[in-house]
């Protein structure tokens, strides 16, 4: 297996050196139970690009009518290598909008993946940098490393301003009340409703990424500079597959951070004793169990963590972990299809919740609420939920957040939850509070 050891270099500088090439990406993932990065994957110049919207295209040419991105990718992954985690393969995003392949309706925001049979792999625990390649890459990895080692770190100036929102406080309170009516009538137990800020920015995408990682260290951080750029620091996996193990970590239940250690602990205690938050979390753990069970061996599904509190820069969340062993004939694409869309971004039951989201939200979700990550040539996969992120096109960015609505939700409180969730991303964009 072609794996070249290279002189170590700061991954941010290496990514910066690679930006002259097409469709660069940087994915950073943490070890289980830690937000400290374990591996960073960096590459560019995919061999081909898959776009799935109202059909599947490869490099701009329509190849099928398949609208489900996970099924489309499954049919295109022909190569396999021995190893673990990411060693080349598909990197990109599944747009939330592709739920219309499940519930009907037009897909307006395509899912996009590049196929990268070459990638830099940086191991944060050892400081080792290596370059995996199935074929000769369209760039010289050693020359890029040398260039990166000479790169000067610099802070970019610039900022952003909010230009509009699809739902201010009054409108969002109305949306939440309408969602609660569907809960009272028995359509759903919970529905996740979101709102968006549109922002004008003159900040470089890599600077936004650097600021966001510093402000909000998270298990998953990413920058993908495709035709659309996505930059994010997500706390939550939609699903991961390592070997034959399929894992979902549902996060549900949110409280703000305290200004002091004592206030923070009080808010954590209140969060864990809040009946509404507990009920919401248990509901979504059950949903994750069902998703994992759909593709796992009978009797292999288990709950390995329950009601842990994880703390981020502006919020703290309750998290659990559901694990199963993939059934015979099932692979990472089947696992992610079972998980998509994440129940923590729709509510339960999923299908009816998605229909209500379509009806009540004031604008389409685009990539937000979908997933960002990789499908490796090793058979492993890791997809973060596309939240705590900015979607950037030219000088315009959109930032979105949602809140889980249940029968006793207080609409005004849910509005402030969306504000708290967006705060770190807006701050990274340079929007003044």
Curated annotation (Swiss-Prot):
Residues at which L-tryptophan binds: 29, 219-221
* Reaction(s) this enzyme catalyzes, per UniProt: chorismate + L-glutamine = anthranilate + pyruvate + L-glutamate + H(+)
Any inhibitors or activators noted? Feedback inhibited by tryptophan.
Part of which pathway? Amino-acid biosynthesis; L-tryptophan biosynthesis; L-tryptophan from chorismate: step 1/5
| Keyword list, A-Z | Amino-acid biosynthesis, Aromatic amino acid biosynthesis, Lyase, Magnesium, Metal-binding, Tryptophan biosynthesis
Q: Which GO terms describe its biological process?
A: L-tryptophan biosynthetic process
- What Gene3D superfamilies does the record tag this protein with? Anthranilate synthase
Cofactor(s), names only, from the UniProt record:
Mg(2+)
Tell me which domain of life the UniProt entry assigns to the organism this sequence originates from: Archaea
**Binding site residues for chorismate:** 253-254, 368, 388, 402-404
Q: Which Pfam families does its entry note?
A: Anth_synt_I_N (PF04715), Chorismate_bind (PF00425)
EC number(s) from the headed UniProt entry: 4.1.3.27
| Signal peptide range in chain numbering | none
Cofactor binding mode and count? Binds 1 Mg(2+) ion per subunit.
Q: Name one GO molecular function term.
A: anthranilate synthase activity
UniProt keyword ATP-binding, yes or no: no
> Which InterPro entries does the record cross-reference, listed alphabetically?
ADC_synthase, Anth_synth_I-like, Anth_synth_I_N, Anthranilate_synth_I_arc_typ, Chorismate_C
Q: Quote the record's binding site residues for Mg(2+).
A: 280, 417
What role does this protein play? Part of a heterotetrameric complex that catalyzes the two-step biosynthesis of anthranilate, an intermediate in the biosynthesis of L-tryptophan. In the first step, the glutamine-binding beta subunit (TrpG) of anthranilate synthase (AS) provides the glutamine amidotransferase activity which generates ammonia as a substrate that, along with chorismate, is used in the second step, catalyzed by the large alpha subunit of AS (TrpE) to produce anthranilate. In the absence of TrpG, TrpE can synthesize anthranilate directly from chorismate and high concentrations of ammonia.
Description of how the protein assembles with itself and partners: Heterotetramer consisting of two non-identical subunits: a beta subunit (TrpG) and a large alpha subunit (TrpE).
NCBIfam families registered for this protein in UniProt = PRK13572.1 (NF010087), TrpE-arch (TIGR01820)
Query: Which family does the record assign?
Result: Belongs to the anthranilate synthase component I family.
Protein name as annotated: Anthranilate synthase component 1
User: Which source organism?
Assistant: Thermococcus kodakarensis (strain ATCC BAA-918 / JCM 12380 / KOD1) (Pyrococcus kodakaraensis (strain KOD1))
Name the gene for this chain. Answer: trpE
